[in-house]
């Protein structure tokens, strides 16, 4: 049916599991579409059993325009906002404004700049403007009265609170150095893996394997206060440590770049959109260190509820993987009840988690490069 919409000058923007679709028209008049409706409602042509275009029109349940409240994102709705009017005058909000993927990238950028100009005229502040191949998003700090009109802009897809990382570090297992095999000398030709996380602390197993410590942006610092990034770096550098404890030495399988992208308070940096932060980090490390393997063990608990679409974070990673010819590994399925802490779960449960009973399982698979 998408071909039918294209013939009418309509662009398919979004679908969901309830068979609702969002279309964008290049003209306000919708002349071609209205002509088909008029023909359908008119007399049945001679020699035909059914009205004109009945095969097309009968598949449509109802037609309506998007309302401002339809643009409320999942996070802001879960925060208790059910109507645009819930955004209060005099109250400031930090919000992500995402545009539909309409027209050209330049056209989307111009529309974003118009929205930015309006918000700034109302006393709001621009935090970030990301204009990528598919995703166009701005992050603003604005009052209720200055952001409410943006919910009525047709080109706006969603307005939402910024995402938050789902970080849970496992309990630390302590070993005395005398109780584990010695660390084997590091092979200088080992591949480099960039760990985009909470930072990486000093550790005797990792000390000579750390190629660089960087933060994006730099004001995040380098220390791993949460402890999550250090654990992820250990897995990247050593694999399954348990399998090596009975050996004669600990073998590293990779060198590590620590790329800190999370604050010490376990939040994403509030002055950057996630697409902007991911693109800056991955492009920079690829250019400066030739890094082609990236690990992102940071979840977004709301990503499963992106309303029938691939979200901006996943889309940006897909684009970067293609543009730079890099591998990006993203954790999935390692939350209760599937903890992913045993090898058996990877065989017996994880494949079903990806494939079984989910109409949007292809979206999950897009995260695995």
Where are these regions (language model features)?
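Subtilisin-like serine protease catalytic core
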Residues: 182-214, 220-273, 323-325, 338
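Substrate-binding/access-modulating region of protease and related hydrolase catalytic domains
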Residues: 110, 114, 145, 263-368
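A short acidic (Asp/Glu
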Residues: 34, 204-210, 218, 304-309, ...
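Short loop/turn segments at strand-loop or loop-helix junctions that form parts
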Residues: 90-92, 96-102, 196-198, 258-264, ...
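Autoinhibitory N-terminal propeptides
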Residues: 1-118, 126, 130-131, 156-185, ...
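Catalytic cores of nucleotide-enabled group-transfer and carboxylate-activating enzymes in metabolic
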Residues: 140, 146-161, 175-180, 184-186, ...
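Glycine-rich, histidine-containing beta strand-loop boundary motifs that form or position
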Residues: 161-163, 197, 204, 260, ...
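Aromatic/histidine-rich interaction motifs
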Residues: 130-143
